[in-house]
């Protein structure tokens, strides 16, 4: 495909803002069209932008674009194992097993909803303890992260538990490092690794997480039986023992560790950050917050929590949550590569070429959304105020590599968000007005996080 002429050594890196690659890619698409070639250093990459092109690639050509490329930092961490950056039979088997295990553990079912209500209770008690004084947005993270941990480890943590706090800190530090331009440079020029420290710091932190995970794996090994599969770790270890005489079982220690690590990382940051954004956007737009609270008041019985099923009677709230996920473009893109030689929209893409399907360009596609750069819940409502599904709503990606935890994330987000707004009104801290809340320059980590901000939670009568 067409694209800018690469310079020696740097390729087209001078045209890309590494902190907001997604914005740079959309700008280049205006000049070169929805499919173009870019050079990151010596790496040739094909970029796909806009709803039509990205959806066609991920849905109609799902087998062709199913692989992940080799990325130096993830090669060093996972060595081709796990869920996120594995390919081929290892990926297919691990993913299939993970999806069925998570379903058996209640993902997307009512049993997990009970856990979410329990966690909501703890979160609300925590927020009440601030007594209306300002607290930071990451204070919300403990609840959604605990839901993921309960599925992985078999039980929730107390919010003051030292292991819980250590894991939260390490995940946070790893996510921040993943957004660092230096890490990008290491991925483009791994042979210059000796010049960069970031990847070494990162590998050390990942090892600190593994030390904790090994303790849980050891405990699970010691008392596992088929009647006591209480967690994802239990399920993996039970599967490993089932296949221990199988010569080329894919459930070896390295793949088990990599899979758990992927779930710890990807299954926590995304939902926690989305919840932070949802509260920040309610602080920014108090009239939208009020309309959500009015709908909750009409629909949910006083003294009980909204269930996920209630969303069908809460079109405005449902639209607001969808718009939060569209507007924040949380995970701008995760690279793919072609599994086979591929002909796509008149272009030949050889096997193994890196492909970037830009999810940001879909969520902000001006042919699909009336006001793509504004927070506007009407994107998901018809003239009568009914909720409307939109094909271009793809924050979880789509096709064979879509997000494994999508059904869990949607349920958590709805139950937590509604429960919080049922109990509190969220306002900026004293001396800060709605217009002071900056949404335009997110913090680039593995995801796009809101800038550090504080909120005040005022208890509702």
Predicted feature descriptions by range:
Residues 103-107, 145, 180-181, 205-275, ...:
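Conserved cytochrome P450 catalytic core segment spanning the I/J/K helices
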Residues 39-46, 106-118, 127-150, 158-166, ...:
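Cytochrome P450
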Residues 13-26, 30-33, 211, 215, ...:
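Conserved cytochrome P450 K-helix E-x-x-R motif and the immediately C-terminal K′/meander segment
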Residues 357-385:
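Conserved cytochrome P450 K-helix/beta-meander segment immediately N-terminal to the heme-binding cysteine loop
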Residues 1-16, 21-115, 134-136, 140-149, ...:
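Cytochrome P450 substrate-recognition site 1
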Residues 286-288, 406-446:
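Cytochrome P450 heme-binding "Cys pocket" and the immediately downstream C-terminal segment
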Residues 144, 148, 153, 205, ...:
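Central I-helix of cytochrome P450 enzymes
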Residues 266, 345, 383-413, 440-444:
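Cytochrome P450 heme-thiolate "Cys pocket" and heme-binding signature region
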């Amino acid at each position: 495909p067409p694209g800018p002429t690469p310079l020696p050594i740097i390729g087209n890196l001078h045209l890309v803002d590494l902190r907001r690659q997604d914005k740079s890619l959309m700008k280049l698409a205006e000049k070169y069209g929805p499919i173009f070639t870019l050079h990151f250093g010596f790496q040739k990459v094909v970029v796909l932008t806009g709803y039509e092109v990205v959806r066609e690639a991920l849905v109609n050509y799902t087998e062709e674009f199913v692989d992940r490329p080799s990325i130096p930092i993830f090669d060093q961490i996972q060595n081709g194992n796990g869920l996120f950056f594995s390919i081929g039979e290892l990926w297919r088997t691990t993913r299939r097993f993970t999806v069925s295990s998570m379903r058996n553990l209640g993902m997307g079912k009512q049993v997990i909803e009970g856990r979410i209500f329990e966690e909501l209770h703890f979160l609300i008690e925590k927020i009440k303890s601030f007594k209306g004084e300002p607290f930071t947005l990451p204070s919300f993270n403990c609840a959604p992260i605990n839901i993921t941990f309960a599925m992985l480890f078999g039980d929730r943590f107390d919010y003051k538990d030292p292991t819980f706090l250590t894991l939260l800190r390490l995940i946070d530090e790893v996510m921040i490092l993943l957004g660092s331009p230096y890490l990008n440079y290491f991925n483009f020029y791994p042979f210059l690794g000796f010049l960069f420290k970031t990847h070494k710091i990162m590998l050390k932190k990942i090892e600190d997480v593994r030390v904790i995970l090994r303790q849980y794996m050891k405990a699970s090994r010691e008392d596992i039986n088929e009647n006591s599969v209480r967690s994802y770790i239990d399920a993996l270890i039970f599967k490993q023992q089932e296949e221990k005489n199988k010569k080329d079982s894919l459930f070896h220690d390295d793949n088990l560790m990599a899979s758990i690590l992927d779930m710890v990382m990807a299954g926590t940051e995304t939902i926690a950050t989305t919840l932070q954004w949802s509260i920040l956007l309610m602080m920014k737009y108090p009239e939208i917050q009020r309309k959500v609270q009015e709908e909750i008041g009409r629909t949910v019985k006083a003294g009980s929590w909204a269930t996920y099923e209630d969303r069908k009677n809460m079109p405005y709230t449902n639209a607001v949550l969808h718009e939060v996920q569209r507007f924040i473009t949380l995970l701008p893109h995760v690279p793919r590569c072609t599994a086979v030689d591929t002909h796509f929209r008149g272009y030949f893409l050889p096997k193994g070429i890196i492909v970037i399907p830009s999810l940001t360009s879909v969520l902000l596609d001006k042919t699909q959304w009336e006001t793509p750069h504004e927070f506007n819940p009407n994107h998901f409502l018809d003239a009568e105020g009914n909720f409307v599904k939109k094909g271009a709503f793809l924050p979880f990606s789509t096709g064979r590599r879509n997000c494994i935890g999508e059904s869990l994330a949607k349920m958590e987000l709805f139950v937590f968000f509604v429960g919080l707004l049922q109990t509190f009104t969220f306002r900026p801290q004293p001396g800060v007005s709605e217009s002071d809340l900056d949404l335009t320059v997110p913090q680039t980590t593995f995801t796009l996080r809101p800038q550090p901000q504080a909120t005040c939670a005022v208890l509702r009568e």
